[in-house]
Swiss-Prot record:
Top-level lineage group: Eukaryota
Disordered: annotated span: 1-25
Taxonomic lineage of the native organism: Eukaryota, Metazoa, Echinodermata, Eleutherozoa, Echinozoa
Listed name of the protein: G1/S-specific cyclin-E
Pfam family for this entry, one: Cyclin_C
Amino acid sequence: MSRRSGRLQSRQDNQPLTECISDENNLPMCTRKRKTREQDTTGVSKAEEVQRRRQQFTIENRWVPISESSSIETSLLVPMQTKEPSTPSEELMDTANWVTFRNLFPAHVSDRASPIPLLHWDDLPEVWTIMTRKEALCPRKHDCLKSHPSLGERMRAILLDWLIEVCEVYRLHRESFYLAADFVDRYLAAKENVPKTKLQLIGITSLFVAAKLEEIYPPKLHEFAYVTDGACTDDQILDQELIMLMTLNWDLTPITVNTWLNAFMQICNAEEIANRKTNFHFPSYSSTEFVQVAQLLDVCTLDIGSMDFDYSILAASALYHVTNEEVTLSVTGLKWDDIAACVQWMSTFAMTIREVGVAQLKNFKNIYAGDAHNIQTHCSSLELLDKSHEKQRLLREASCCSPVQVPGVLTPPQSDKKSKKGVL
């Protein structure tokens, strides 16, 4: 080995590991050790910790006086205040684990079994659970008019009946009307001393918001203002829209009575759906029966007494009056005790409709025939409401005048406890 070769060999032997050496093709090759997995994990956790700490503080600019006539600007780190969730959606997102999430809901909700059959293409029991829990998070307030001395039950009925007419004129879906009715009731429950002069503005604004949510081609703003006959302008509707959205905390997707009715009617045909080979299913139920049940719900919604019941109970009770008890309990997952009170309250409305005549399916121009039953129609709902109230009054008078019927055989009192009055 030559003297030069010996020096090169000793140089390569003493070369540190952090330097790069060359192979026979003169390509650099790094010999530095890679970071271990523990080191990488530590680095990521430190970065996350720094980011978490940054989110706990905010920078606040302040002026610090240095003399009587001058001051300098400085910055301070101020801890951020924890914002409480203001809506049910934020409350759900704020939960840390499943146990906390589950404890947000009443215990009776989980006891309600899902009537939806198990199909191979989706986890339908989970859908049912979400629907029941969402309804439990948004209870209805039956005393929504209590804090409004200038408003009455009749005014609310007239407003909702007028909204039904507007929906039929513009070919709006039933879901749009029931969303608007829900917005009106929730808005009145959250406000106080609303004057009767603003009631029409509240109603048309609710329908304006609902149409934008539900309809593919909702009517224009000026069309909603036009149907008020000059009572509401475009600017007033826009201003009221912002007020209403803030009052409702932007919770605009309740499970309406129309949604429950569609679900129950679809479950009635579960066997037919399960036998199909396709994975995509359209709504499959009788349009005529759906319209009859929807007519009963339209009339009942005008009555303030409907606020005493949840939407699912109203839909199940209306289905009971059109079908029978066996079908209703099987497709709703409810028990008779759950719907008994609502069925009894709704009986006068059902009798009135049977006397006057049930609604028939209407066909609309430029509306697909298979979707015609979903278009909101006006069937003299206010007149049916008045007749139902008259029937309720007559039934109350008859029950007060009739003697009390005591079941079983009456047992006479003992001889020593009989009254001596009138004995000769």
